[in-house]
Curated annotation (Swiss-Prot):
Main location: plastid
Compartment annotation: Plastid, Chloroplast
Region (II), start-end ranges: 569-760
This protein's name: ATP-dependent Clp protease ATP-binding subunit ClpA homolog CD4B, chloroplastic
Alphabetical list of CDD domains matching this protein: AAA, RecA-like_ClpB_Hsp104-like
Keyword Transferase assigned: no
Encoding gene, per UniProt annotation: CD4B
Native species: Solanum lycopersicum (Tomato)
């Protein structure tokens, strides 16, 4: 594109006159351009250098930078035949990126039409196609679009031959437009050439094809010029008011492009109100009033309101409630991502940043706010280049640049503290997390904004619930951010609920879709009579749906008018959002759930036979937690279940998970025999840095983070290494544990159950006196004696600080023969269910059941021998018969024991045996 400018017959005199003006290049480049401009004759023609002199001239001119403008202009210095003329680089240094884009689009339009030149008409198409500049906006407001303009251009000049050179030259009129655009910029007091100046130059030239195109499209050139001047004036006023500092009125394109004026937004009322944070805002004001190193850096956890402090300062400045040191200043937030974006060539980023710093220094009324200030480090750095932090350091130290930074504690430590030279230039301002009471006040200040957005109302109870519930249940985020998110999502939920179609309308919509589908099929099948009937039905349904929607809107409108500003968000909505986020039930207990909780022991006893003490203790803990009476800073409950093997310690935890938490999989189970060695203990919280598995997290901490409301079972706790007990002290007391990455995991909504076989030998010795021959009082006294002995054993095995943190130590009883018989019924039912899947009906006789209990009863081993007896006597016999094809799908089978004690399997479809079996007992 730039080579096309070489075709100029003379250097514009206005450009040649720029020899004495400021030139944005190195000293060497300035001298080269001055030399070339001075070498012109009175007609301002310049003969190209040849040979070695030409190469040197090229090198001298091109080696000045890598900006977009210089890239375009550099192409003009390549060797050309004698008599060739070009536009000097100084003109392109003044082009904005939008103006460069216009010229490039003009070339594309020339190629599209097959023309080997760029005239005024192509520049006009480029101005329209650019789309975002002042020129494009004015032309669009006049009703001129790219499609119509292309048609008019093609009507006037037609299409070219199709052969287009790589370098398309500019026509003399197009060069005249460029010259006039520079003059227009000077007259407006601008030190740059934008798309608006190109349009003004185009209108001023007034004799090219572009003028005819505008005339044909019905646009008045004088009206266009007036609109451009007006928009340029408004832009200047806006920039002067928001960036330039009022009196100077100078335009600051770099700051305007990469920054957002918070003070202007505050004046327009577009910022959320800032409640509290007075000490932090005053400290920031004090630091900004210093002579040097006047750069505060807001440091705090994510979501505590660091950006809000900068917005609060902008609001104070807008209201005039600040000391004279910063009165009238503008807070501009800098978008670092936008500043870096698109810098493809070396030097572009540095040039943008230097321009931005120059504009801030010239204004002397700008306070720069950089959110995520740690992104300065490394921004724009490439091989051999320096990053943004090092470019800004001198200005930050001397007080030439007032900058407010904001970053998190981790990022500050990771990036800024590693660079002491940068750290000393920023003065840290700690931003603590607000308390629950402060958060409630913040929510009250924001309430009006969210009510307007969601078109509903919040009560004070909603705001209190949002602050308290978010503090209690959402542990991995910080106030006030998580509380604000709660009321925001609750408002969205209520609004969507009220905006839904009534059920009747949904049914009609479903029917309408089906009828439309049938109508289309009828049309395709050329059954037009049926299609006509369906069309009539379709129109009828549409009318009904429209009537229902209108009626629903009227009802909603009436409700809104009755409630002043719309639906009401309730505390239950806030609770529902917390539950959906965390999985923790915080809603009020419903009638059905209340009945379930009251009958919890009865339900658990359908699976757990005996062990009343343990079942009652767990049920009490769940009820206490569900109604909100538990200590909010400790787990729901922590138990240690001790007793002989096979009496239901682990089974009770599984039954609780299945009944109350949904399934056995909802339980987090850790077999402590896997943590017997010292080096395996770290698996609970994650490997330390430098070890394999560091990034994966701990088995315990990660499981609880994903499912904070659950049962955690530490099976066979006495098998664990003693270091595990040290780790569990803070879980049992404070309900928290820090993993290997320093993240705090919340155990306040978990039920901790530890099982142990410590004391089983004592129970076995004393168990001989527990049986059918003892009455109730003797059983209780024997159990109490054994319980005290087991407790002593536990005290000898575990350290006192560990046992002292447990809520209860529950000793399980040995199973009696009657209890084993009930357990046998439960186990047999499980076998029946497995066979029912295979369509085999199984029944057992009373004799068989007694045989199973006799073989499976062992007071020392609990119910596990019973499981082995059922497997040997029933499952093995059934498996042999099924493999021998004696039992098939659909058969009814009775299992009995003959007079010799052998198990017999009787198939109901194979006839009656000679010795009839007794009546089967349903289990």
């Amino acid at each position: 594109m730039a080579r096309a400018l070489v075709q100029s017959t003379s250097i514009p005199s206005s450009v040649a006159g720029e020899r004495t003006t400021k030139f944005n290049g190195s000293g060497k480049t300035k001298r080269a351009v001055t030399m070339l401009c001075n070498a012109q004759s009175s007609s301002l023609t310049l003969r190209d250098f040849t040979g070695l002199r030409g190469c040197n001239a090229i090198d001298t001119l091109v080696r000045s930078g890598e900006t977009l403008q210089s890239k375009v202009a550099a192409a003009t210095y390549v060797r050309r035949p004698r008599g060739c003329r070009f536009v000097p680089k100084a003109m392109f240094e003044r082009f904005t990126e939008k103006a460069i884009k216009v010229i490039m689009l003009a070339q594309e339009e020339a190629r599209r039409l097959g023309h080997n030149f760029v005239g005024t008409e192509q520049i006009l198409l480029g101005l329209i196609g650019e789309g975002t500049g002042i020129a494009a906006k004015v032309l669009k407001s006049m009703g001129i679009n790219l499609k119509d303009a292309r048609v008019e251009v093609e009507k006037i000049i037609g299409r070219g031959s199709g052969f287009v050179a790589v370098e398309i030259p500019f026509t003399p009129r197009a060069k005249r437009v460029l010259e006039l655009s520079l003059e227009e910029a000077r007259q407006l007091g601008h030190n740059y050439i934008g798309s608006e100046h190109l349009l003004l130059g185009l209108l001023r030239e007034g004799e090219g094809v572009a003028a005819r195109v505008l005339e044909n499209l019905g646009a008045d050139p004088s009206n266009i010029r007036t609109q451009v001047i007006r928009m340029v004036g408004e832009s200047n006023e806006a920039v002067g008011a928001s960036v330039g500092g009022g009196t100077s009125g100078q335009k600051m394109p770099t700051l305007e492009e990469y920054g957002t004026n918070l003070t202007k937004l505050a004046e327009e009322g577009k910022l959320d109100p800032v409640v509290g944070r007075q000490p932090q805002i005053e400290r920031v004001t004090q630091i900004l009033g210093r002579r040097t190193k006047n750069n505060p850096c807001l440091i705090g956890e994510p979501g505590v309101g660091k950006t809000a402090i900068a917005e609060g300062l902008a609001q104070r400045i807008a209201n005039g409630d600040v000391p004279e040191t910063i009165e009238g200043k503008k807070v501009i937030t800098l978008d670092m991502g936008l500043l870096v974006a698109g810098t493809k060539y070396r030097g572009e980023f540095e040039e943008r940043l230097k321009k931005l710093m120059e504009e801030i220094k010239q204004s002397d009324e700008i306070i720069l706010f950089i959110d995520e200030v740690h992104t300065l480090i490394g921004a724009g750095a490439a091989e051999g280049a320096i990053d943004a932090a090092n470019i800004l350091k001198p200005a930050l130290a001397r007080g030439e640049l007032q900058c407010i930074g904001a970053t998190t504690l981790d990022e500050y430590r990771k990036h800024i503290e590693k660079d002491p030279a940068l750290e000393r230039r920023f003065q840290p301002v700690k931003v603590p997390e607000p308390t629950v009471d402060e958060t409630i006040q913040i929510l009250k200040g924001l309430r009006e904004r969210y009510e307007i957005h969601h078109k509903l109302r919040y009560t004070d109870e909603d705001l209190v619930a949002a602050a308290q519930l978010s503090y209690q249940y959402i542990s991995d985020r910080f106030l006030p951010d998580k509380a604000i998110d709660l009321i925001d999502e609750a408002g969205s939920r209520v609004r969507l609920r009220h905006a839904q179609l009534p059920e009747e309308a949904k049914e009609l919509e479903k029917e309408l879709r089906q009828i439309t589908k049938e109508k289309n099929e009828a049309v395709r099948g050329q059954d037009f009579e049926k299609a006509g009937e369906l069309r009539d039905r379709e129109m009828d349904l549409k009318a009904q749906i429209t009537a229902l929607i209108d009626k629903n809107k009227e009802v909603s409108k009436a409700e809104s008018e009755a409630a002043d500003t719309g639906p009401l968000v309730t505390e239950a909505d806030i609770q529902h959002i917390v539950s959906s986020w965390t999985g923790i039930p915080v809603e009020k207990v419903s009638t059905d759930e209340s009945d379930r909780l009251l009958k919890m022991e009865e339900t658990l006893h359908t699976r757990i036979i005996g062990q009343d003490e343990a079942v009652k203790a767990i049920s009490r803990a769940i009820r206490r937690a569900r109604v909100g009476l538990k200590n909010p800073n400790r787990p729901i409950a922590s138990f240690i279940f001790s007793g002989p093997t096979g009496v239901g310690k682990s089974e009770l935890a599984k039954a609780l998970a299945a009944y109350y938490f949904g399934s056995e999989e909802a339980m987090i189970r850790l077999d402590m025999s896997e943590f017997m060695e010292r080096h395996t203990v770290s698996k609970l919280i994650g490997s330390p840095p430098g070890y394999v598995g560091y990034t994966e997290g701990g088995q315990l901490t990660e499981a609880v983070r994903r499912r904070p409301y659950t049962v955690v079972l530490f099976d066979e706790i006495e098998k664990a290494h003693p270091d595990v007990f040290n780790m569990m002290l803070q879980i049992l007391e404070d309900g928290r544990l820090t993993d290997s990455k320093g993240r705090t995991v919340d155990f306040k909504n978990t039920l901790l159950i530890m099982t142990s076989n410590v004391g089983s030998s004592v129970i076995e010795k004393g168990g001989r006196r527990i049986g059918f021959d003892l009455d109730l009082d003797e059983k209780d006294s024997s159990y109490n004696r054994i319980k005290s002995l087991v407790t002593e054993e536990l005290k000898q095995y575990f350290r006192p600080e560990f046992l002292n943190r447990l809520d209860e130590m529950i000793v399980f009883r040995q199973l009696t023969k009657l209890e084993v018989k009930e357990i046998a019924d439960i186990m047999l039912k499980e076998v029946f269910e497995r066979l029912k899947v295979k369509e085999i009906e199984l029944q057992v006789t009373e004799r068989f059941r007694d045989r199973v209990v006799d073989e499976g009863y062992n007071p020392s081993y609990g119910a596990r021998p019973l499981r082995r007896a059922i497997m040997r006597l029933l499952e093995d016999s059934m498996a042999e018969k099924m493999l021998a094809n004696e039992i098939k799908e659909g058969d009814s089978v009775i299992v009995d024991v003959d007079s010799d004690g052998n198990v017999t399997v009787l198939n109901g479809s194979s006839g009656t045996p000679s010795d009839p079996a007794p009546e089967p007992i349903p289990v």
